[in-house]
Curated annotation (Swiss-Prot):
The lineage of its organism: Bacteria, Bacillati, Bacillota, Bacilli, Lactobacillales. Residues 16-121 form the Core-binding (CB) domain. One of its GO terms (biological process) is DNA recombination. It is found in: Cytoplasm. Site-specific tyrosine recombinase, which acts by catalyzing the cutting and rejoining of the recombining DNA molecules. Essential to convert dimers of the bacterial chromosome into monomers to permit their segregation at cell division. Residues 169-354 form the Tyr recombinase domain. FtsK is required for recombination. This is Tyrosine recombinase XerS. GO terms for cellular component: cytoplasm. It comes from Streptococcus gordonii (strain Challis / ATCC 35105 / BCRC 15272 / CH1 / DL1 / V288). Keywords: Cell cycle, Cell division, Chromosome partition, Cytoplasm, DNA integration, DNA recombination, DNA-binding.
């Protein structure tokens, strides 16, 4: 989603929210949470507060009028009723017979509410230096995690990774084979953004950075001589990330055409640009997601930018067998998150079984 549209939708939601949600928003913006994360949280609060109005828990007529006391006095049974509502309500999509949202969506909703309750009961300060209230009902609400072993998850993910030679083959396919299938009109559009698209995909595959970290890169963050980039990690921390050498020619080629192709001036600091009616802008995450999906589906299987991050992590672990190194590359504080990659790279286990 374009940044301007995202901010417009955020403002629309904020206009309907109670004062304490607006305070929460400002507090998390200072952390900083990304606008995308805050937008998703606001959507969850909108869903929750609409249920509060419908359920008769409050006499308020509008979301903005729901008093803080409603959240303070919310019971465990109330929250369980909300979860049942999510699980059983008919979906708006007329093409499905399924009732209720998925467990993943429910967990996301509860995560957003947990964040809000933690803020209200622990983080915020009133005039006396105390939180608004102390009772956190979300601590009593259990979440159900998707039942899937790490090995099963790894096997599912493995089918959507470009491992071994496939990393370079994917880039070569976009460069040489993909344009052969296009009409003259589509080819013109492809050629305009070819160097940029290849540079973005090469960077994701060569560094493992998150999509948000890639699109927020500025020119000053790129050091092609050292093959290092500076990114802003989750929580606002700056980090230096090494980039594999195979991405260098793609990044250099994009840089050579960036200013002229996208009409960039010195004031246009964003590294990856898009151009509309002669005006350069920072490329948005939604455009990259669509671009990666388009190329990957034509090559092998439709994937997300996050799967390219998984690809780099898996290849790096396969080469080093070091979870610490992989964790550092991905910007994780612990190696627990990287356990997944030890299961994806399980050739030793399979070889042992084949010898039985």
């Amino acid at each position: 989603m374009r940044r301007e549209l995202l901010l417009e939708r955020i403002d629309k939601l904020k206009a309907t929210m109670p004062w304490y949600i607006l305070e929460y928003y400002q507090s998390k913006l200072a952390v900083p949470y990304s606008f995308t994360t805050l937008y998703e949280y606001l959507k969850e609060y909108d869903r929750f507060f609409n249920w509060v109005l419908e359920s008769g828990i409050t006499n308020a007529s509008h979301i903005a009028e729901i008093p803080l006391s409603v959240l303070e006095n919310m019971t465990k049974k109330d929250m369980e009723a909300f979860i049942l509502y999510l699980r059983e309500r008919p979906l708006l999509n007329a093409n499905t017979t399924q009732n209720g949202v998925s467990q993943t969506t429910i967990n996301r909703t509860l995560s957003a509410l947990s964040s809000l309750y933690k803020y209200l009961t622990e983080e915020v300060e009133n005039e006396q230096g105390e939180p608004y209230f102390y009772r956190n009902v979300m601590k009593k609400v259990a979440t159900k995690k998707k039942k899937e072993t790490l090995a099963a998850r790894a096997e599912n993910i493995k089918q959507k990774l470009f491992l071994g030679d496939e990393t370079e083959e994917f880039l070569q396919y976009i460069d040489r084979e993909y344009p052969k299938k296009l009409s003259n009109r589509a080819l013109s559009s492809f050629n305009k953004n070819k160097e940029r698209d290849l540079a973005i995909i090469a960077l994701l595959l060569a560094s493992g950075v998150r999509l948000s970290e890639a699109v927020n890169l500025d020119l000053k963050d790129i050091n092609l001589k050292m093959m290092v980039i500076e990114v802003t990690r989750k929580g606002g921390k700056r980090d230096s990330v090494n980039v594999a050498a195979f991405a260098k020619p793609y990044l250099e080629e994009y840089l050579s055409i960036r200013s002229k192709r996208y009409k960039a001036e010195k004031t246009d600091t964003a590294f990856f640009l898009t151009e509309y009616r002669g005006t350069p802008n920072r490329i948005d995450a939604s455009s990259v997601e669509k671009m990666v999906a388009k190329y990957s589906e034509d090559f092998k299987v439709r994937v997300t930018p996050h799967k390219l991050r998984h690809t780099l992590a898996t290849r790096l672990y396969d080469a080093t067998k070091s979870q610490v190194l992989v964790s550092h590359q991905l910007g994780h504080a612990s190696t627990q998150v990287t356990d997944l990659y030890t299961h994806i790279v399980n050739d030793e286990q399979k070889n042992a079984l084949n010898k039985l």
